[in-house]
């Protein structure tokens, strides 16, 4: 067991055969996430009593992490597109014993009128090209095409359109991807600011000081594997006006 970068509670575990052989995992004492994914809950900075909607939540790591940061107060509505994905979230809820996360099936591209301005925080960790995790999934680069890139950007914007409607006035929207593609990251940020009543807000008060940089002062963080020793990952923090 080694200390992982940036977060004191993040550990790197090695020299084991399978995650299911670890008692700490089976007992729900640990949850598997890259440090980059852990930074989503850090950037969201939920307060006790917050209502959070996690729109693309499976397998539930970010939802459970956000719930843990609130203790037993507040709640997380963890959604994904299929029953299979909702069941993955439920499996992790059961294993970790969290009591304030509820999993359900909800297509993130389909408007849910019951969620209109309902959330203090919305997490939109959207489907992406995955260019930030090619080191773990090298097959991604053989499947990439310009057409697929355009299609994924359209999907992301459909989800962001719904996410924008679910945040309360003065609430927080976290937009994240596991890619390094500008089309899916910075260009989506510019598109979103142009079309919705939001402003970027710096995540610096909530993330480790080592990660503070010019872009985080503006409101977003791009992690690069060769520099940050994490997955390639993008996080933007928006405040609804």
Predicted regions: what they are:
Residues 1-241:
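S-adenosylmethionine
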